[in-house]
């Protein structure tokens, strides 16, 4: 069986950044396994700008951003396999994969970084009443069809959910000649970045219906119309508030979830993000097995994905060199009131640097509040 020092599952921005970080910290035997036809992952279909402001101090499109990392991969001669689907991994770091060149194959790794990204929630996740006609599609899939294959999925469009992909597709569909009748958001606030609300909706006079949801899908074979209703504070549909929209396409932007199936299958403890629990090195509960990027928790900016992936790459290099200290003094992080989750889930005080970055997401927008860090009931910091 072939053995490699480091195998990275996923060749998107997280996988490439982790590989570059590990290489630059002394790991030369690296293999990236990527299921797609090209490196770069989701960035291949993100032809809009807004990437790289933190990483390069420039505003780049998705393909421009990923090309800079692909160039670094090529310069370092880091090996990668494309069109390669990983079937499973085991606790002893054995990976089974399949592709057209190798067929079904198995490889042993001394260390693994999982960077498999995230998935879109589909219509089945929210159980909208009505038929199941064609024309109901996730926003990311519509983006793929339009930006990579040149297919406009509809002419009269409504979007459910105000996530960033949905907002960006509202603008993209408008620019390509479709009529976007509106965006409905279940919550009383948008889940997208403020800049996307301004640039993608307000600049194009696309209405945003807060505290609304699609309450019915109409059409048997093809989508004919939808009903949009208000919801109350319990997120239940308010009877008598339905408005009918004649559309041929409903785009769903109803959330992303980590694509964590490989780690779940081997029993890696799961955090509130639906990703795996990790320490400050992005190492899971299994020694030498790391996770980073959207498979860990969904990021707003790819620049933040890259930062996190570098930590995982450095952690893997330390593990391979025997430099990771297994101390006895560990503390767990826990999300308090108003906070959805915290990453990392665990910090090793014997190994911790002077500065540890905690990443978290609030449950809802709030004003005039403090962020309080406490330990054993004592306030450490208040900002």
Where do the model's predicted regions map?
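A Rossmann-like FAD-binding core segment of flavoenzymes
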Residues: 68-97, 107, 174-261, 354-383
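Predominantly flavin-linked oxidoreductase catalytic cores and closely associated redox partners
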Residues: 104-105, 114-208, 213-222, 288-291, ...
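FAD-site-proximal beta/loop scaffold in flavoenzymes
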Residues: 136-146, 249-299
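Short amphipathic alpha-helical segments
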Residues: 19-21, 44-45, 125-128, 170-172, ...
